[in-house]
Design a protein with these regions (language model features):
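Generic long, charged, amphipathic alpha-helical segments
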Residues: 205-229, 294-305
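Conserved ATP-utilizing enzyme core subdomain
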Residues: 281-300
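Short acidic-hydrophobic surface loop/beta-edge motif
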Residues: 124, 138, 168-170, 290-294
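Function-dense linear segments that define catalytic or interfacial modules
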Residues: 137-222
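Conserved "right-hand" nucleotidyltransferase catalytic core of DNA-directed polymerases
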Residues: 1-160, 176, 183-186, 229, ...
Length: 305
Protein backbone atom coordinates (compact mmCIF):
# COMPACT_ATOMS: atom_id res chain seq x y z
CA UNK A 1 0.00 0.00 0.00
CA UNK A 2 0.99 3.65 -0.32
CA UNK A 3 1.30 3.93 3.46
CA UNK A 4 3.82 1.07 3.56
CA UNK A 5 5.85 2.08 0.48
CA UNK A 6 5.94 5.85 0.82
CA UNK A 7 5.86 6.38 4.58
CA UNK A 8 6.77 3.39 6.73
CA UNK A 9 9.69 1.94 4.76
CA UNK A 10 11.54 5.24 4.15
CA UNK A 11 10.99 6.16 7.80
CA UNK A 12 12.68 2.98 9.04
CA UNK A 13 16.02 4.19 7.64
CA UNK A 14 15.58 7.59 9.28
CA UNK A 15 14.85 5.98 12.65
CA UNK A 16 17.87 3.69 12.34
CA UNK A 17 20.16 6.68 11.78
CA UNK A 18 18.59 8.51 14.74
CA UNK A 19 19.10 5.53 17.06
CA UNK A 20 22.68 5.05 15.89
CA UNK A 21 23.52 8.74 16.33
CA UNK A 22 21.96 9.00 19.79
CA UNK A 23 21.92 12.22 21.79
CA UNK A 24 24.86 13.74 23.65
CA UNK A 25 24.46 14.15 27.41
CA UNK A 26 26.48 15.74 30.22
CA UNK A 27 26.78 13.21 33.07
CA UNK A 28 27.95 15.90 35.50
CA UNK A 29 24.82 17.95 34.75
CA UNK A 30 22.69 14.88 35.42
CA UNK A 31 24.41 14.43 38.79
CA UNK A 32 23.76 18.08 39.71
CA UNK A 33 20.15 17.63 38.67
CA UNK A 34 19.79 14.66 41.01
CA UNK A 35 21.29 16.70 43.87
CA UNK A 36 18.83 19.53 43.25
CA UNK A 37 15.94 17.08 43.32
CA UNK A 38 17.17 15.50 46.55
CA UNK A 39 17.38 18.91 48.21
CA UNK A 40 13.87 19.94 47.28
CA UNK A 41 12.42 16.51 48.14
CA UNK A 42 13.95 16.77 51.63
CA UNK A 43 12.44 20.24 52.11
CA UNK A 44 9.00 19.00 51.08
CA UNK A 45 9.25 15.96 53.33
CA UNK A 46 9.98 18.19 56.33
CA UNK A 47 7.15 20.58 55.44
CA UNK A 48 4.61 17.77 55.00
CA UNK A 49 5.55 16.14 58.32
CA UNK A 50 5.32 19.49 60.14
CA UNK A 51 1.88 20.23 58.70
CA UNK A 52 0.72 16.71 59.55
CA UNK A 53 2.04 16.98 63.11
CA UNK A 54 4.32 13.95 62.89
CA UNK A 55 6.35 11.68 60.64
CA UNK A 56 4.81 9.02 58.39
CA UNK A 57 5.60 7.32 55.07
CA UNK A 58 4.47 9.79 52.42
CA UNK A 59 4.87 7.10 49.75
CA UNK A 60 2.32 4.86 51.47
CA UNK A 61 -1.19 5.65 50.14
CA UNK A 62 -2.70 3.95 53.21
CA UNK A 63 -0.73 6.05 55.72
CA UNK A 64 -1.19 9.21 53.67
CA UNK A 65 -4.96 8.72 53.47
CA UNK A 66 -5.25 8.16 57.22
CA UNK A 67 -3.20 11.28 57.99
CA UNK A 68 -5.14 13.53 55.59
CA UNK A 69 -8.70 12.35 56.12
CA UNK A 70 -8.68 11.04 59.70
CA UNK A 71 -5.93 12.79 61.62
CA UNK A 72 -6.22 16.16 59.84
CA UNK A 73 -9.96 15.78 59.17
CA UNK A 74 -9.71 17.09 55.61
CA UNK A 75 -13.16 16.66 53.99
CA UNK A 76 -13.66 14.93 50.64
CA UNK A 77 -11.98 11.61 51.37
CA UNK A 78 -13.11 8.62 49.29
CA UNK A 79 -12.89 5.27 51.05
CA UNK A 80 -11.88 2.21 49.02
CA UNK A 81 -11.31 -1.44 49.98
CA UNK A 82 -7.70 -0.68 50.87
CA UNK A 83 -8.28 2.66 52.60
CA UNK A 84 -8.72 6.26 51.52
CA UNK A 85 -7.98 7.10 47.89
CA UNK A 86 -5.10 9.52 47.41
CA UNK A 87 -5.22 9.35 43.62
CA UNK A 88 -4.30 12.41 41.57
CA UNK A 89 -7.91 13.37 40.80
CA UNK A 90 -8.78 13.36 44.52
CA UNK A 91 -5.81 15.54 45.45
CA UNK A 92 -6.37 17.91 42.51
CA UNK A 93 -9.73 18.97 43.94
CA UNK A 94 -8.30 19.58 47.42
CA UNK A 95 -5.03 21.30 46.46
CA UNK A 96 -6.39 24.87 46.13
CA UNK A 97 -7.55 24.86 49.78
CA UNK A 98 -4.87 22.84 51.57
CA UNK A 99 -1.14 23.70 51.32
CA UNK A 100 -0.14 20.21 52.47
CA UNK A 101 -1.86 18.74 49.40
CA UNK A 102 0.14 21.01 47.10
CA UNK A 103 3.33 19.88 48.84
CA UNK A 104 2.34 16.23 48.43
CA UNK A 105 1.66 16.73 44.73
CA UNK A 106 5.05 18.38 44.24
CA UNK A 107 6.72 15.65 46.32
CA UNK A 108 5.20 12.94 44.14
CA UNK A 109 6.22 14.71 40.97
CA UNK A 110 9.82 15.20 42.09
CA UNK A 111 10.29 11.65 43.40
CA UNK A 112 9.10 10.37 40.02
CA UNK A 113 11.52 12.71 38.26
CA UNK A 114 14.34 11.39 40.41
CA UNK A 115 13.65 7.71 39.79
CA UNK A 116 12.82 8.09 36.10
CA UNK A 117 15.37 10.68 35.02
CA UNK A 118 18.07 11.54 37.56
CA UNK A 119 18.64 7.87 38.44
CA UNK A 120 17.10 6.20 35.40
CA UNK A 121 18.92 8.01 32.59
CA UNK A 122 22.35 7.48 34.14
CA UNK A 123 22.08 3.76 33.43
CA UNK A 124 21.70 4.41 29.69
CA UNK A 125 24.71 6.68 29.11
CA UNK A 126 27.15 4.86 26.83
CA UNK A 127 30.94 5.11 26.57
CA UNK A 128 30.40 7.74 23.86
CA UNK A 129 28.56 9.95 26.41
CA UNK A 130 25.38 9.44 24.43
CA UNK A 131 22.00 7.89 25.07
CA UNK A 132 20.74 5.65 22.27
CA UNK A 133 16.99 5.21 22.67
CA UNK A 134 14.84 2.79 20.66
CA UNK A 135 12.18 4.32 18.42
CA UNK A 136 9.27 1.92 17.99
CA UNK A 137 7.58 2.30 14.63
CA UNK A 138 4.83 -0.32 14.77
CA UNK A 139 3.80 -0.61 18.42
CA UNK A 140 1.18 2.10 19.00
CA UNK A 141 -2.39 1.62 17.77
CA UNK A 142 -2.47 5.06 16.14
CA UNK A 143 0.78 4.93 14.16
CA UNK A 144 2.61 7.38 16.39
CA UNK A 145 6.19 6.64 17.36
CA UNK A 146 7.06 5.51 20.85
CA UNK A 147 10.45 5.57 22.55
CA UNK A 148 11.87 3.02 24.99
CA UNK A 149 15.08 2.19 26.85
CA UNK A 150 14.81 4.98 27.82
CA UNK A 151 11.69 6.92 26.84
CA UNK A 152 12.99 10.24 25.48
CA UNK A 153 9.61 11.37 24.15
CA UNK A 154 8.24 12.18 27.58
CA UNK A 155 10.77 14.62 29.01
CA UNK A 156 8.79 16.70 31.56
CA UNK A 157 7.80 20.31 30.97
CA UNK A 158 5.23 21.24 33.63
CA UNK A 159 7.41 21.65 36.72
CA UNK A 160 10.36 24.02 36.87
CA UNK A 161 12.64 21.28 38.18
CA UNK A 162 11.24 18.99 35.50
CA UNK A 163 12.25 21.39 32.74
CA UNK A 164 15.79 21.55 34.12
CA UNK A 165 16.43 17.99 32.92
CA UNK A 166 16.73 19.41 29.42
CA UNK A 167 20.07 20.96 30.34
CA UNK A 168 21.44 17.41 30.50
CA UNK A 169 20.97 17.01 26.73
CA UNK A 170 23.36 19.07 24.61
CA UNK A 171 23.91 19.47 20.85
CA UNK A 172 27.12 18.40 19.18
CA UNK A 173 29.83 21.00 18.65
CA UNK A 174 28.83 23.70 16.15
CA UNK A 175 25.24 22.41 16.22
CA UNK A 176 22.01 23.64 17.80
CA UNK A 177 18.72 22.06 18.83
CA UNK A 178 15.66 23.14 16.86
CA UNK A 179 12.00 22.66 17.72
CA UNK A 180 9.31 22.71 15.02
CA UNK A 181 5.67 22.37 15.97
CA UNK A 182 2.53 22.53 13.85
CA UNK A 183 0.06 25.18 14.96
CA UNK A 184 -3.25 23.57 16.06
CA UNK A 185 -2.68 20.68 13.65
CA UNK A 186 -5.56 18.57 15.03
CA UNK A 187 -8.12 21.31 14.43
CA UNK A 188 -6.73 22.11 10.99
CA UNK A 189 -6.97 18.44 9.96
CA UNK A 190 -10.51 18.35 11.36
CA UNK A 191 -11.42 21.40 9.27
CA UNK A 192 -9.95 19.76 6.16
CA UNK A 193 -11.50 16.31 6.64
CA UNK A 194 -14.93 17.51 7.76
CA UNK A 195 -15.16 20.24 5.15
CA UNK A 196 -17.02 22.40 7.66
CA UNK A 197 -17.31 25.79 5.99
CA UNK A 198 -17.51 27.75 9.24
CA UNK A 199 -14.31 26.26 10.66
CA UNK A 200 -12.47 26.62 7.35
CA UNK A 201 -13.56 30.25 7.15
CA UNK A 202 -12.40 30.81 10.74
CA UNK A 203 -8.91 29.64 9.77
CA UNK A 204 -8.93 31.74 6.62
CA UNK A 205 -9.49 34.81 8.80
CA UNK A 206 -6.08 34.07 10.36
CA UNK A 207 -7.36 35.16 13.77
CA UNK A 208 -7.25 33.43 17.16
CA UNK A 209 -9.32 30.27 16.45
CA UNK A 210 -10.31 29.79 20.09
CA UNK A 211 -11.52 33.39 20.38
CA UNK A 212 -13.49 32.99 17.13
CA UNK A 213 -15.11 29.81 18.46
CA UNK A 214 -15.91 31.52 21.77
CA UNK A 215 -17.49 34.42 19.91
CA UNK A 216 -19.72 32.08 17.90
CA UNK A 217 -20.59 29.60 20.67
CA UNK A 218 -21.27 32.23 23.34
CA UNK A 219 -22.85 34.73 20.91
CA UNK A 220 -20.42 37.44 21.96
CA UNK A 221 -18.75 40.03 19.69
CA UNK A 222 -15.19 38.94 18.89
CA UNK A 223 -13.67 41.98 20.61
CA UNK A 224 -15.65 41.35 23.80
CA UNK A 225 -14.74 37.68 24.33
CA UNK A 226 -13.35 37.21 27.84
CA UNK A 227 -10.30 35.12 28.72
CA UNK A 228 -12.57 32.63 30.51
CA UNK A 229 -14.77 32.25 27.43
CA UNK A 230 -11.70 31.72 25.26
CA UNK A 231 -10.31 29.13 27.70
CA UNK A 232 -13.62 27.25 27.70
CA UNK A 233 -13.84 27.39 23.91
CA UNK A 234 -10.29 26.04 23.64
CA UNK A 235 -11.24 23.08 25.86
CA UNK A 236 -14.24 22.38 23.63
CA UNK A 237 -12.23 22.80 20.40
CA UNK A 238 -9.61 20.25 21.36
CA UNK A 239 -12.00 18.08 23.37
CA UNK A 240 -14.28 17.54 20.37
CA UNK A 241 -11.34 16.21 18.33
CA UNK A 242 -10.81 13.44 20.87
CA UNK A 243 -14.48 12.65 21.45
CA UNK A 244 -14.89 14.29 24.83
CA UNK A 245 -18.17 13.68 26.65
CA UNK A 246 -20.22 16.29 28.50
CA UNK A 247 -19.08 14.66 31.75
CA UNK A 248 -15.42 14.82 30.71
CA UNK A 249 -15.73 18.46 29.72
CA UNK A 250 -17.51 19.28 32.98
CA UNK A 251 -14.59 17.77 34.90
CA UNK A 252 -12.02 19.72 32.85
CA UNK A 253 -13.80 23.05 33.29
CA UNK A 254 -15.25 22.49 36.79
CA UNK A 255 -18.79 23.14 35.56
CA UNK A 256 -22.01 21.12 35.66
CA UNK A 257 -22.62 18.31 33.16
CA UNK A 258 -25.68 20.19 31.92
CA UNK A 259 -23.64 23.33 31.23
CA UNK A 260 -20.94 21.28 29.49
CA UNK A 261 -23.57 19.60 27.30
CA UNK A 262 -24.85 23.05 26.39
CA UNK A 263 -21.34 24.07 25.27
CA UNK A 264 -21.00 20.96 23.09
CA UNK A 265 -24.48 21.33 21.57
CA UNK A 266 -23.79 24.99 20.78
CA UNK A 267 -20.43 24.01 19.25
CA UNK A 268 -22.10 21.56 16.88
CA UNK A 269 -24.69 24.19 15.93
CA UNK A 270 -21.82 26.53 15.10
CA UNK A 271 -19.88 23.89 13.15
CA UNK A 272 -22.57 21.50 11.81
CA UNK A 273 -20.19 19.89 9.32
CA UNK A 274 -18.09 18.55 12.20
CA UNK A 275 -21.08 16.82 13.79
CA UNK A 276 -21.98 15.21 10.45
CA UNK A 277 -18.36 14.14 9.90
CA UNK A 278 -17.93 12.63 13.38
CA UNK A 279 -21.24 10.76 13.17
CA UNK A 280 -20.20 9.30 9.80
CA UNK A 281 -16.83 8.24 11.22
CA UNK A 282 -18.60 6.23 13.92
CA UNK A 283 -21.17 4.67 11.57
CA UNK A 284 -18.45 3.70 9.05
CA UNK A 285 -16.32 2.19 11.81
CA UNK A 286 -19.30 0.19 13.08
CA UNK A 287 -19.90 -1.16 9.59
CA UNK A 288 -16.25 -1.86 8.63
CA UNK A 289 -14.70 -2.61 12.03
CA UNK A 290 -11.96 -0.03 11.49
CA UNK A 291 -11.38 3.68 10.90
CA UNK A 292 -8.94 5.08 8.37
CA UNK A 293 -6.63 8.09 8.25
CA UNK A 294 -6.08 10.41 5.28
CA UNK A 295 -3.01 8.35 4.40
CA UNK A 296 -4.81 5.01 4.46
CA UNK A 297 -3.69 3.85 7.90
CA UNK A 298 -6.35 1.62 9.40
CA UNK A 299 -7.06 1.26 13.10
CA UNK A 300 -9.25 -1.70 14.04
CA UNK A 301 -12.10 -0.84 16.43
CA UNK A 302 -13.89 -4.20 16.77
CA UNK A 303 -15.60 -3.06 19.96
CA UNK A 304 -17.91 -0.91 17.79
CA UNK A 305 -19.16 -3.87 15.77
Amino acid sequence: SRLFRELEMPLSYVLYSMEKEGILVKPEELHLYGEALNGRIAELETSIHEQAGGEFNINSPKQLGEVLFEKMQIPGGKKTKTGYSTAADVLDKLAPQYPIIKDIQEYRGLTKLKSTYADGLAAYIGEDSRIHTNFNQTITATGRLSSTEPNLQNIPMRMELGRRIRKVFVPDENCIFMDADYSQIELRVLAHMSGDEQLIEAYKMDEDIHRITASKVFHTPFEEVTDLQRRNAKAVNFGIVYGISSFGLSQDLSISTKEAKGYIDEYFKTYPGIKTFLDKLVSDAKEKGYCESMFGRRRPVPELK
